[in-house]
Amino acid sequence: MAHQAHAYHMVDPSPWPLTGAVAALLLTSGLAVWFHFKSLTLLAMGLLLMILTMIQWWRDIIREGTFQGHHTPPVQKGLRYGMILFITSEVFFFLGFFWAFYHSSLAPTPELGGIWPPTGITPLDPFEVPLLNTAVLLASGVTVTWTHHSLMEGKRTEATQALTLTILLGLYFTALQAMEYYEAPFTIADGVYGTTFFVATGFHGLHVIIGSTFLAGCLLRQILYHFTSSHHFGFEAAAWYWHFVDVVWLFLYVSIYWWGS
């Protein structure tokens, strides 16, 4: 690329939006094929192409921001607005699940026995694994903030340790959630209660896995000296996302586990 003599965000020609779109097509059609014909081939192809696209697209962005110096203050401002809009869209995504839950629980139909939880459903105890999960995610929110402050103060070792701890807490949360799903006394097929419970908590769990991956990428970059005390928006975006995941869990815990039980 020719030397950039201005501060603004000019995107180079890239094949990754096209390969990402093809991967999305393969994933969605592959999911339908898996459900109806029990074949995983198309789904596996879509997943592989999506992973390769993500790795190479992120590699290009890291090169532009870290080695080529293209992430100037106006570009960083645009990236910040982009991340804020993305998180706003995620808020509305989860709003749909809360709407479905409250629509079903505040006025239970005769088919549900006129009560909530519906007749025949044994809800999970909110003061057992769900409470531990809440403590784990809140602790991870503290450690990710510790990472940010350490980065801003130039304390590299502390930042690396705190970020590692955050990722471990995220993985612990995922393991606890998997155990809870395995031992749950109801399934996704158990009416509207099972559906809203597993879809809402399942999508949140997926977001925890995505956030943990995002933070793991930041840990690798931190080890490779990509971040400075004043230039670390990649980590900031991951931290914002992680705090969003924390807040969604608090609403899920209070609504579905505690009030809904």
From Swiss-Prot:
Domain of life: Eukaryota
GO biological process, one term: mitochondrial electron transport, cytochrome c to oxygen
A Gene Ontology molecular function term of the record: cytochrome-c oxidase activity
Catalytic activity: 4 Fe(II)-[cytochrome c] + O2 + 8 H(+)(in) = 4 Fe(III)-[cytochrome c] + 2 H2O + 4 H(+)(out)
InterPro entries according to UniProt: Cyt_c/ubiquinol_Oxase_su3, Cyt_c_oxase_su3_dom, Cyt_c_oxidase-like_su3, Cyt_c_oxidase_su3-like_sf, Cyt_c_oxidase_su3_a-hlx
EC number: 7.1.1.9
PROSITE patterns: COX3
Subunit structure: Component of the cytochrome c oxidase (complex IV, CIV), a multisubunit enzyme composed of 14 subunits. The complex is composed of a catalytic core of 3 subunits MT-CO1, MT-CO2 and MT-CO3, encoded in the mitochondrial DNA, and 11 supernumerary subunits COX4I, COX5A, COX5B, COX6A, COX6B, COX6C, COX7A, COX7B, COX7C, COX8 and NDUFA4, which are encoded in the nuclear genome.
Function text: Component of the cytochrome c oxidase, the last enzyme in the mitochondrial electron transport chain which drives oxidative phosphorylation. The respiratory chain contains 3 multisubunit complexes succinate dehydrogenase (complex II, CII), ubiquinol-cytochrome c oxidoreductase (cytochrome b-c1 complex, complex III, CIII) and cytochrome c oxidase (complex IV, CIV), that cooperate to transfer electrons derived from NADH and succinate to molecular oxygen, creating an electrochemical gradient over the inner membrane that drives transmembrane transport and the ATP synthase.
Protein name: Cytochrome c oxidase subunit 3
Organism per entry: Polypterus ornatipinnis (Ornate bichir)
UniProt gene name: mt-co3
